Amino acid sequence: MNARIASVFVLAGALMLPATGQLATPNAAGVSAGHIHLYVSDVAAQQKFWAVMGGVLVANQKLEMIQFPGVFILVRRGETKGGTVGSIVDHFGFAFKDLPAAMAKWKVEGYKIEQDGDSNHGYILGPDGIRLEFFGNPSLKVPVQLDHIHLYPQDVPAMQAWYTKILGGVPAKRAIGGSHEQIDCIDIPGVILAISKSETKLDSSSGRSLDHIGFEVKDLPEFLKRAEAQGATITQKLTPSNFSSKMRVAFITDPWGTKMEVTEGLAP
């Protein structure tokens, strides 16, 4: 990591509260938000982007992660089929306590910002086609926080039912990204899964720059046993992590092509 990126991470870390490294308390199924895993062409450029967003570089033994309150961003170099747009996971969204100050930093760095007349909401395009929704929320207790991950299936009720059954999520309708429009969601501790109907079948997230989303699970072997019995597709069985001796992982995929890593022991 070059000196400039390191200095941005140090500054961001000084603004974060120590407690924000903890993941949310899991739901009754033992599930909470965990991580978002990106495959990118330029790791340094991606690290810089997330540092400017307010992330803090941390490590779980050999596993380097960019920490935000309640979630981690993992970045790995790799070839991809494209960015997030056109994938089942179109984008994810962050809330910012002081949005004008945050946007001023983004403009200095030259990042592309899209807004439709609402000064409190918009999208920023990161390296490798990572689309990030943003909005201001002055009531936040931290400078920045994950708000939602936005999925676009053809069958919204079926997706809600699947995430309720497999991950113990709670169906809801919420205004996402500062909008007044109520859309279908699934509440998971630490993140909202926003679900909007797509008229066409979108690509799987696998192989895209946002390759998969991650959930931290309490008692992962029991979770996988239960999920498989309920019809979930286990694409990689339980295995120890190659990066941390205290962590184990598995992969599942929903019926719409959303690739998910389920972990136990993710946080440093």
Task: Name each region found by the language model.
Residues 1-5:
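Positively charged n-region of N-terminal signal peptides that target proteins for export
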Residues 6-18:
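Bacterial N-terminal signal peptides
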Residues 20-28, 103, 107-151, 173-197, ...:
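Vicinal oxygen chelate
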Residues 26-31, 82-87, 139-145, 204-208:
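Short, low-complexity disordered segments enriched in Ser/Pro/Gly and basic
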Residues 28-30, 37-73, 114-123, 151-193, ...:
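Core segments of cupin and vicinal oxygen chelate
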Residues 39, 93-95, 150-152, 214-216:
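Short hydrophobic/aromatic beta-strand micro-patches
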